[in-house]
Amino acid sequence: MIITMILIFVFGYLCIALEHKLRIDKAAIALLMCGALWTVLSLLGNDAQIGTQLIEQLGDTSEILFFLIGAMTIVELIDRHGGFHVITDHIKTRNKRKLLWLLSIITFFMSAVLDNMTTTIIMIMLLRRMISGQKERWIFASVIVIAANSGGAFSPIGDVTTIMLWMRGNVTSGLLVAKLFLPAPVSVIIPTAIACRYIPDENAHPEKLDTAPKLPPFVGPRFSHFVLVLGVGGLLFVPIFKAVTGLPPYLGMLISLGVLWVFTELVYDHKQNMEESIKNRVSKVLKHIDMPTILFFLGILMSVAALQSAGLLTDFADFLDKNVHEVYTIAGITGLLSAVIDNVPLVAACMGMYPVVDTAALASSLDPVYMQAFVQDGIFWHLLTFCAGVGGSLLIIGSAAGVVAMGLEKIEFGWYLRKITLLALAGYFAGMLVIFLEHLLLG
């Protein structure tokens, strides 16, 4: 059964990589792969609880999907009311290389507060207003993905995995930020500097794209500002809602969408002289949400969930612990794997394999030097946070931000592999080196 599931996953993965040549949408491949893996697990596995596991995994996946639908709808609503023009109008530089650096910096710090998916959606919408060439936009979007993943890695609320480690007590917020505040920017600076060589040193001349927002009559800058503030405020509300209530972030996102929905409905209801066909109501905007991306995400996450339910991830963690026994290598390999496999189950597997070591366990350990890495705020947890987050940038389907960018900009898997993977890899290892030097010099 295990071999069959691995073969199905590898074959499906290759088909997704060759999507452009096969001319089959990656969402269809992901859904078929998901169905095949769960079917094999059900027919050949001995677990009577497979139905229960499927429902549990679907519940976890649905949280992400509803979060994504809510975020994409809010961002699309802001865009259709010209809200992003408020931001782009304040970006004075039109030099493409300076623009690349500026968008990279904004993305990095924004993703430390917002989640990576939302940040990527917002920045790509901004990007479409400034860069008209598709291949150039792919380079910009790829750097945005790298910056979003790196920015999310050093903040306790910046990524799902950092939230997991923070809420479970593996790391504390202050030390996490302090230890990764240098490595995380380094992992962005190096790829951005290299990517600048792919961009001509000239001014951008954006054309009027089909995706440009069509503002209804009587909707002026004031309404655009209101929608922007309410939308971004709603996105910022999500991590606060999570921290205060302990409820899943998707619920906060749906609340934010509901508030914005009610606001726009009330405004349009007072525009009685406006034709209904030109009103950008949420019910109309929802028709433009990229559903193939949502379904692709569903297929990929549920495929990984099938591998997790089969015990493959736990078995691999056991293998690393027994045969490697070195924290930098274990965390480094985990990060490389996160480019292929969703980092959430990988981090969850590591947390299950390596519980936080308390003082008593450390004192009685036969190998206290090694076990010191697993205490609260130990070097392993900071490494794992960095590697699992930044490692997702190595492939376009390695992170939620990458999948969203792939869907929005139709970035080809092979193009990203050829043009961006080595850049991201350089930043990844440079960041690990900074962590090593920090630990060596500062402890």
Regions found by a protein language model. Give the residues of each.
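Transmembrane helical segments that form the transport core of multi-pass membrane transport proteins
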Residues: 81, 90, 103, 234, ...
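Alpha-helical transmembrane segments
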Residues: 59-70, 175-191, 245-258, 330, ...
